């Protein structure tokens, strides 16, 4: 969780005296020695015949020494040392702890000559799981699912990059997810909320890392696995001041790098994207972090790939889905990743159109290894896997369209699941894109339906697509540099898009050729997730420090935001009314500017506006949007609040309110779909959908009934998607259920209705066309 209010990571460390010791250490002379040995019987102690291991790296966190030919080492400890650690070599595991706690010895200026570390050979797999910001303090179902995942997947370790969260969380996870009960090494890094106030070391220095060290051992160390060297580093600032400085960590990294072969691939861990810690003299391939509550893959100018991930337990601030990241690598440091989305479990939903069956086949913990269609009479048709979520088969031509069939799937955990075909309601066509789709609302113009995709895993298949509105055929695709999560804009025959790396594109809507592209200013938050808005020859992109207006024809910057409000993220799409541009900065507030000049007009920073993520609706010269627990109408130019209703729900969704028939319709994070009376803002009705199969609304994690989708009106009904994997149709006046379409995965976009045809996308990258009559 980011609560640093966007201060530079290093401001707290600029004073030369911050880390000066409070006691005289000139007489300090603690020495530590011992042996690193091959523990043949793996009992955690050195027995007769078990020999020492030469050239093993041992460190006190400041300097590094190597064992001699007999496996013995001796180190003169730094006065601020806390642990003596052996850096686990490739192909080995520790049979006792990889560190020895020397804090009491340091305080007493004692020496210790009996530090023994056992190592045993083990298999390595070139793979690990990554999660971050787990922030729980009680045992929940997702921990059991993580143990299932660990039992099924052969991996070298599991990395948790910080914000285990506060003393209660640290102590809980030091027991709940250990090497022993997870069946592999657990690598924890310290986050800003893991630095706990109220502690001093034996020299009187602030000691924010004390509780973390009590629970997990050293906050920085390294190890090697599957040909790659891994460096674990600590968060540099946080809720309490640590005893270490950035210079301490940088100096230790240089010491550490002396112990590995030149050119060996290196990956680094930290709670944040601490680019200042990346050494220039090393072959750093990846930096793994959390903190920003995002699912992001991005490559810097230096060539280092940064991977951010949240947790499988909950959704994150930028509405990134609840997931862990599986990272696979080889000895050259080449990396591929895959997201495992939760809490979806043993899940099959099948559709058939024009003789082709496509099925969602997915389980968060295990992998589908086989899927097949079971026809009437028991005949089976093998399915092929299109992506990590979708399987496909072509049915025999002789089958009647109304035939009933089942889909069977087998998973690596031994489970076999069978599901009956969904009875289709007017499915005209269905197209599976080579990437996933997120909040991007489909746009139709002429013969084309435009959508955009994301690839948070490897950024290989990110593109804008033009599909034939009648058949779903992909007429063209335009590759972009990274994921597009927000809305496209269409104006004067040009599609405008923005990817998560802050690149804005103008694309010819007829042939998919890029007319211009431009990189806009990055902000403190690393990911551009908001939608693009275009009108009157201008393209509006970004939020906070990246907010700008571009000339739609040339991409030239017309103005940039000079009112540098902060922001964690923004997933809504900016809107204009009466010449005013309304934008959003999650955790900070709503901000409004003159659309022509960029002049700052007004801001709202109360709690309802701070925790607001909905795209605003425009009604005449006003904006209507949701706050954390409220729906508001404000005058566009002045910001005057004209109406406000507060409700016992959380509106932490992207859902854009629909104003229709004297009502406001909108989705909630936790309680389904809501209709309120526009005249007095009183609740008209509330419809409860099913619990989310994948969480996307920030901090949802406990079977919340989430609707991120924006509603559309159709006759006297309202249609919207939901995170439970359904598209719903309800009566506007009373919320009476009319019908629902079972898609199987979250529908996050705003459905589109054109000529009595309903278009929408799902999380897996399926595009659907249904006839409404």
Task: Describe these PLM feature segments.
Residues 27-32, 40, 88-90, 95-172:
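N-terminal active-site segment of His-dependent metallophosphoesterases
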Residues 30-33, 38-62, 368-372:
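Short, ordered, surface-exposed loop/turn motifs in non-cytosolic proteins
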Residues 44-46, 52, 59-72, 76, ...:
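Short, acidic Ser/Thr/Gly-rich low-complexity loop/linker segments typical of extracellular
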Residues 62-64, 79-94, 568:
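A short, solvent-exposed beta-strand micro-motif common in secreted/extracellular proteins
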Residues 90-96, 103-105, 170-262, 278-286, ...:
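Extended active-site neighborhood of metal-dependent phosphoesterases/phosphodiesterases
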Residues 295-377, 394-397, 402-408, 417:
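Binuclear metal-dependent phosphoesterase catalytic core
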Residues 425-445, 453-461, 476-489, 516-535, ...:
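Extracytoplasmic beta-rich repeat domains
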Residues 468-471, 508-512, 551-555, 594-598, ...:
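Short loop/turn segments that connect beta-strands within beta-propeller blades
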């Amino acid at each position: 969780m980011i609560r640093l209010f966007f201060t530079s990571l290093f401001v707290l460390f600029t004073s030369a005296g911050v880390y000066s010791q409070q006691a005289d250490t000139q007489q300090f002379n603690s020495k530590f020695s011992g042996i690193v040995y091959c523990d043949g019987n793996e009992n955690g102690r050195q027995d007769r015949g078990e020999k020492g291991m030469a050239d093993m790296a041992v460190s006190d966190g400041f300097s590094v020494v190597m064992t001699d030919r007999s496996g013995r080492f001796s180190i003169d400890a730094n006065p601020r040392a806390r642990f003596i650690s052996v850096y686990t070599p490739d192909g080995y595991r520790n049979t006792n702890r990889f560190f020895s706690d020397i804090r009491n010895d340091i305080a007493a200026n004692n020496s210790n000559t009996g530090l023994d570390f056992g190592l045993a050979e083990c298999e390595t797999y070139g793979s690990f799981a990554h999660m971050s910001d787990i922030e729980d303090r009680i045992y929940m179902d997702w921990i059991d699912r993580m143990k299932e995942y660990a039992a099924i997947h052969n991996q070298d370790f599991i990395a948790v990059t910080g914000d285990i969260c506060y003393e209660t969380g640290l102590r809980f996870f030091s027991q709940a997810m250990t090497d022993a009960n997870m069946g592999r090494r657990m690598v924890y890094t310290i986050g800003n909320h893991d630095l706990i106030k109220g502690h001093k070391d034996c020299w009187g220095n602030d000691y924010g890392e004390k509780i973390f060290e009590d629970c997990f051992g050293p906050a920085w160390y390294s190890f090697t696995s599957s040909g790659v060297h891994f460096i674990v580093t600590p968060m540099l600032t946080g809720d309490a001041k640590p005893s270490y400085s950035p210079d301490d960590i940088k100096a230790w990294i240089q010491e550490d790098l002396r112990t590995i072969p030149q050119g060996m691939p290196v990956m680094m861990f930290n709670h944040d994207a601490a680019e200042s810690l990346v050494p220039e003299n090393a072959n750093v391939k990846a930096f793994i972090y959390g903190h920003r509550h995002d699912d992001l893959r991005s490559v810097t100018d230096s060539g280092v790939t940064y991977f951010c991930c949240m947790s499988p337990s909950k959704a994150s601030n930028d509405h990134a889905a609840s997931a862990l990241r599986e990272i696979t690598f080889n000895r050259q440091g080449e990396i591929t990743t895959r997201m495992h989305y939760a809490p979806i479990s043993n899940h099959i939903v099948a559709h058939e159109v024009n003789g082709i069956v496509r099925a969602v086949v997915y389980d968060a913990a295990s992998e589908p290894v086989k899927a097949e269609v079971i026809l009437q009479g028991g005949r089976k048709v093998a399915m092929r896997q299109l992506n990590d979520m979708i399987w496909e088969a072509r049915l025999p031509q002789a089958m009647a369209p109304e035939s009933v069939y089942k889909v069977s799937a087998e998973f690596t955990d031994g489970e076999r699941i069978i599901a009956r075909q969904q009875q289709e309601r007017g499915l005209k066509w269905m197209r599976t894109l080579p990437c996933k789709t997120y909040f991007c609302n489909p746009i139709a113009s002429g013969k084309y339906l435009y959508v955009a995709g994301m690839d948070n895993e490897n950024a290989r298949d990110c593109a804008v697509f033009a599909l034939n509105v009648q058949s779903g055929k992909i007429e063209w695709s335009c590759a972009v540099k990274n994921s597009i999560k927000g809305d496209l804009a269409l104006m004067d025959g040009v599609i405008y898009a923005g990817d998560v790396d802050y690149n804005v594109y103008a694309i010819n809507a007829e042939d998919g050729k890029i007319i211009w592209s431009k990189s806009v200013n990055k902000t403190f938050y690393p990911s551009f997730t908001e939608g693009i808005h275009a009108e009157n020859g201008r393209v509006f992109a970004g939020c906070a420090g990246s907010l700008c207006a571009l000339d739609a024809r040339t991409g030239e910057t017309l103005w940039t935001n000079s009112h540098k409000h902060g922001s964690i993220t923004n997933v809504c799409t900016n809107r204009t009314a009466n010449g005013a541009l309304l934008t959003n900065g999650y955790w900070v507030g709503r901000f409004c500017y003159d659309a022509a000049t960029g002049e700052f007009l007004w801001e709202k920073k109360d709690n309802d506006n701070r925790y607001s993520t909905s795209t605003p609706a425009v009604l005449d010269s006003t904006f209507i949007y949701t706050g954390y627990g409220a729906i508001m109408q404000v005058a566009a130019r002045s910001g005057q609040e004209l109406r406000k209703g507060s409700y016992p729900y959380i509106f932490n969704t992207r859902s854009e309110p629909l104003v229709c028939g004297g009502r406001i319709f909108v989705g909630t994070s936790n309680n389904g779909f809501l209709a309120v009376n526009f005249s007095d803002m009183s609740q008209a009705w509330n419809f409860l959908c099913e619990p989310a199969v994948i969480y996307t609304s920030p901090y949802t994690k406990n079977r919340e009934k989430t609707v991120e989708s924006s509603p559309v009106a159709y006759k006297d009904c309202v249609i919207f998607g939901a995170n439970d994997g359904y598209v719903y149709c309800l009566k506007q006046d009373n919320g009476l259920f009319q019908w629902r379409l079972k898609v199987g995965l979250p529908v996050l976009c705003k459905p589109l209705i054109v000529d009595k045809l309903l278009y929408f996308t799902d999380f897996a990258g399926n595009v659907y066309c249904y006839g409404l009559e």
